[in-house]
Amino acid sequence: MRRLCLFLLALFCCTNTYADAPRTFREAKKVAWTLYADRPVDFYCGCSFKGNRIDLRSCGYVPRKQPKRAARVEWEHIVPAWVIGHQRQCWQQGGRKQCTAKDPVFSLAEADLHNLVPVVGEVNGDRSNFGFGMLSEKPSQYGACPFVVNFKQRTAMRPSTVAAPSPAPICT
């Protein structure tokens, strides 16, 4: 009986030590800050950051149009939330905001920590929901940052040092 009690106690203690995955994008961003605390470097440009402030000089970043947004860290979905959700019924009825509020499957996909990385805010905004592809432009839009956005083609080109994204998850 004593062994059974000890076993059950150990089992209970062990299962409580594992954290649940974040259920919302807001929760995921909080967890992501702790994940990147040991290596506070932006994903696309290699800029260092402290708190939510990007050190633009650390990577030679030059703002294209939005210096205030360029100076802050934002959490980028490598596979855009639009790709994950635009075919879902909730998106048809009110876009991302509706899906975040009403669709727990979308919320979990939006909160996937494997799909979130810290980036320069301006780059996040400029990339929007554009897919990745090869572009002929030389990387100069953002100073020394090797990220390129072609707004007419609705395409972004990631630096060659950044791994390609996995296919978008299928949400049912």
Language-model-detected regions and their locations in the chain:
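N-terminal signal peptide c-region/cleavage motif recognized by signal peptidases
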Residues: 14-16
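Aromatic-lined ligand-binding clefts that engage carbohydrates, nucleic acids, or primary amines
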Residues: 20-72
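Domain-level detector of nuclease and nuclease-like folds
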Residues: 61-74, 78-172
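Residue-level marker of positions within ordered structural domains that often coincide
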Residues: 6, 19, 50, 83, ...
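Sterically constrained small-residue positions within well-ordered secondary structures
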Residues: 10-11, 36, 111
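Sec-dependent N-terminal signal peptides
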Residues: 4-12
